[in-house]
């Protein structure tokens, strides 16, 4: 399963940006270099993005630990644990998601559909707004403000702010979940 997840990471990184670029190229005649905004690759917006992503990830993590979420049938941390990922895998997947998804949604789609619709679509496509699992949808309502804020940040700080925030958010949560999974696994072995 781990190899499949790493493959999905590569697909996200390399293939997700293509439809966004095609939209921008066809309708706005934007080159690939303009699409990835290399001219905006600056330390300050990236640092702001990392700070914001880390901060919001800690808030989301605290909410995810609330007893309310104990009754979710399949918890995200259990899914991550079952993938047998290392922290390095989690960081790689975070980078893939940050770059691939932000180039697709923020850089590609958002200029056509607007911030609010694109943000809701982004959260819904991740499965976090699920009418059949209202308890899990509460997590979607926790992550939606984060996505809205980085979406609005695109105009002021650029795409690399969005990528950095998304990467940092995912990296913190992946790291927590991977470490917790290994800790609970070692605790279970001690009981045997």
Feature roles, as predicted:
Residues 1, 31, 39-42, 135-137, ...:
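Serine/threonine-rich low-complexity intrinsically disordered regions
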